[in-house]
Amino acid sequence: INDDLAEPRTNEYARADKAAAWMLKSKLLINSKVYTGIDRSADALIAVNQVIGSGYKIAQIPFANLFKADNNTNGAQEEIIFPIAFDGDKSKTWGGTTYLIHASCDNPTGITLGIDFGWQGYRVRKEFVESVGNSDPRIMYVPGNNDPESISDYTKFAQGKKLTKFSNNSFHST
């Protein structure tokens, strides 16, 4: 399949290139011993070094911009090796990031994330909050969320901390 793929960073956005294949290969190889009993970590290192040398790099943008609607133009495309694009025009679904955005919030928060309403779904437990603390800038808590960190009743959305990793807003509109 490698011969049929475009060179890294030469394909149109959201189309797999050789770096995507190398990344997948490295992940399979690093886990080979678990599934086959054969240690292929040396082969995984070769594949991941191909990815590292492919031209993709850590984007020099705020971490949250990796998860916004315009991550194909806001600098995130420097880092994202194989995105799955949902643009709302050519690809519509109730899958993709729809659940991830809607379930993370209630209605007032949903509006700030560029959606019409929230589903009041998932939240994180106290143990997660304690493991990362409040100082890690990659953890995006819902602003103003003063709900208790402990969850005693999993049917109550007002318990546990809410995270908002994904947003339907673009970097330039927020």
Tell where the protein language model's regions lie, with residue ranges:
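Extended, hydrophobic/aromatic-rich amphipathic alpha-helical segments that build helical scaffolds
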Residues: 1-4, 12-52, 82, 136, ...
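Elongated scaffold/linker segments in the mid-to-C-terminal portions of large proteins
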Residues: 13, 57-174
